[in-house]
Amino acid sequence: MTQTDSYLLALYDISGIQEYIFATNRMKENVGASRIVGDLMRSQLIKVLKEHESIKVDWQKDMEIELFSNSEFQAEVVFIGGGNALVIYRDHNLCQKVFKEISIKLIEKSYTLTLIAETLEFSYDKTTSYYPLYQELQDTLARKKEEMVRPKPFGALPISAQEHFGGFPITYKDNRSTIQALKEQATESIELEDIIDPPPKKRWAVQINDLKKSPGDDSYIAVIHIDGNGMGEQMKRKLQNLDKNGLSFAEQVKGHRELSLQISQGYKDLVQNVMKTISFEKDILPIRPLIMDGDDLTFLCQADWALPLVVEILKRMESYSGDLSLSACAGIAYVHGHFPFDIAYEIAEVCCKEAKKKRSQNGGQGSYIDFQLVRGSDVSARDVTGRPTNPNNAVLGRYRPYRVSEHEKNGVNTLIECIKQLNEKGTESEMRIPRTKQKLMYQAYLKGTEDAIKAANELLESRGIGDFNETKPWLDAFELADYYEQNLFKSRVVQQ
C-alpha cells in the first residue's frame, strides 16, 4: 500500500469483565475467567496483529513511534493496559480485519465477553497533536459503552439440559456448559499466566478451601477491591501538559506510553513486593488475585489477612515516588465461603466507593478503607450505602471508612490498636476479655443506648483496656476481632 497522510486511531475495550469473572461460586472457574481476561489483550490481540506483516507491537521496549517515519509499517500498538488497547493504523482495511479476527478470538476463548472498538480518522503532519485525538476517541467510546446493549449467547432450548448457575446449555458429558469448560481449561493451562506472579516457591489458592483458615468448615473469606485515586485525572493533566508544551505527536505518544507503563507496572510491582513480605509456611498462599486492570485490583484472601494486607498495600502506594502519585481506596467484603461471589464483589466495590466518598469529603487526600461484615445471606450493596450517617455513629464506635494514616485521629491505626487490645492475652494465656463477654459488649454497642454503652465501657476500663475519656471505634473493633492477623508480616504463621 502506498504511504498516505490518513490514519486511523483505534481504541479497544473489553466489556463485562467483572460479571464474567464472578459469574459463579466455583473458584476454579473464577480463576480461569481471570486468566482468560488477562490473556485477551496482553496476548491474543498481539497474536492477531503478528499474523499480519509490518505491524510494530513491542511498544514497551521501544517507546519511539516509528509508523510515521517508516513506510513499511502498516500499524503500531500505542499501548495496552487498563483493559484497553490503542493502535494506529495506516491501512484502514487492516483495521477492519483485526477487529473481526480479535472478536472471533474473544468468542472462542471466553464465549460471553464483548469487544467494543471505536476509531477516529486523522491526517498526520508535523502540526498534528496527539492528546486531543485521544481524548475525543475516549469520550466517543465511553458514550458507546453507555448506550450499547451487550449481546448474550443463546440460552438452553426446551429440549436441552442446562447448568444450574448461569442457565447455559450443557455441552459436555460431565454436565458442564461451554463457558464452564473454557474457564476450567484456562485454570489448568500452562500457557496462560496469572495476572500477578506469586512469591518464589509459593502458589496462589485455586480452591475455596485454600482460602479458609480451617479447611472444611464454613469460615469467612474476604473479597477485596482496590481502586486508584484520581489516576485518570492525573494522566489527563500530564497529557494536557505535553500538548500545551508544544511537544510533537511522537513525543506525546512516547510520554503516554511511559505513563501507562508506570501505572500498570508500578501497581503490579508494588503488590508483588508486598506479597513477598508475607510470612507463611505453606506452599499455597490463601490469596487469589482475580483482576489487575491498571490501577484496579480485586483479589480474594483468608478473612483475617484482609485488613493487614490492604493497609500494607495502601501504605506502600502512598510512599511510592514517581511521575504519578500512587494512592488508592479499598473496600473489603467479609463473607462465608458459600456466599455468592458476584454479590460479595458488589459489596466490596460499593465499600470502595464509600471510602472514595469520604476521601472527597475530607479534602481529596490520602487513602481510605471501608468494609462490611456479612453475617446473614440476605445482604446486598444497599446495606452499605444505607448505613446511618447520624452523629451517633461516633458514640456507637463506628468510624467507617477509615483513613490509612499514622497521625489520623480514629484512623485505621486506631481501629487496629482497638482490635489488638481486644485480642490481648491475660496472665494464663486466656483472653483478657473472653469472647463471650465481647459478644455481649458488641450487642450493647449495637443497641446504642447510653446505659448499655456505659456498662460496656466500664467493663473494658476495668480490664485495663482503653481510655474512655474519648470515643474510639470499639463497635468496628468488636466486629473484626476474629478477623485480624497481626503477625502477617512479622513472624511465621503456621497452620495445622
Residue ranges and their predicted role:
Residues 1-496:
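Regulatory and interdomain segments flanking nucleotide-handling catalytic cores
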